[in-house]
């Protein structure tokens, strides 16, 4: 098994329900034991090993992995999920923007990226990454968001290095619901380490480190 995981996602790829884990090196696959109904380590995927801080999987099976320091990778696995079939490295989302780190998130089922200057999204139909105008027009100041946590289908926490921001989705637009600056806490979060755990009853717990 792969130790030191930085992100874990339950997803379906090629019709198989699995847990994917990425860490500072391999991409690992976990499957559900049919007897115990518990997740167990299956294998490490061949063909990809890198410093990954977060990732998301889109509806078509693309794995979008954010490098710890620069760019993102788009991966597609073979049918047996044991090796990488396609790999594309994307160093920047727009010409002239050399921000380095690109964050990857999922918002209302859509893959969303941020690079500190804009939000972008992946268009399944065209296979292209384009500016996400819905957020850029109303909340350009949130373009340094590094994590999005879903409270429910219409409420989302945007996590920045200075605050937690709650946005609601109403009538086709995002609306500001609440801002919680880190200065309210005795021990401010470590950079890029803030997170939120949402319990089954909808309570949000703020993780500072």
Give the residues covered by each predicted segment.
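Carboxylate-rich, polar loop motifs that coordinate divalent cations or form catalytic acidic clusters
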Residues: 1-209
């Amino acid at each position: 098994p792969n130790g030191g995981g930085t992100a874990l996602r339950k997803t379906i790829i090629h019709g198989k329900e699995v847990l994917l884990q990425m860490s500072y090196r391999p991409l690992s696959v976990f499957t559900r034991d049919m007897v115990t109904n518990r997740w167990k380590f299956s294998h490490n995927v061949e063909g990809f090993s890198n410093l990954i801080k977060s990732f998301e999987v889109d509806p078509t099976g693309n794995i979008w992995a954010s490098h710890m320091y620069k760019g993102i990778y788009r991966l597609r696995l073979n049918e047996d999920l044991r090796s990488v079939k396609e790999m594309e490295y994307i160093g920047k989302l727009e010409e002239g923007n050399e921000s380095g780190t690109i964050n990857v998130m999922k918002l209302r089922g859509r893959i969303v990226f941020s690079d500190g200057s804009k939000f972008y999204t992946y268009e399944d139909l065209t296979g292209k990454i384009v500016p996400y105008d819905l957020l850029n027009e109303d909340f350009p100041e949130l373009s340094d968001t590094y994590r999005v946590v879903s409270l429910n289908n219409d409420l989302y926490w945007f996590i920045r290095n200075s605050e937690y921001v709650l946005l609601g989705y109403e009538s086709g637009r995002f609306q500001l619901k609440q801002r919680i600056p880190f200065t309210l806490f005795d021990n401010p979060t470590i950079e890029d380490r803030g997170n939120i755990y949402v319990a089954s009853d909808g309570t949000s717990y703020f993780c500072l480190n």
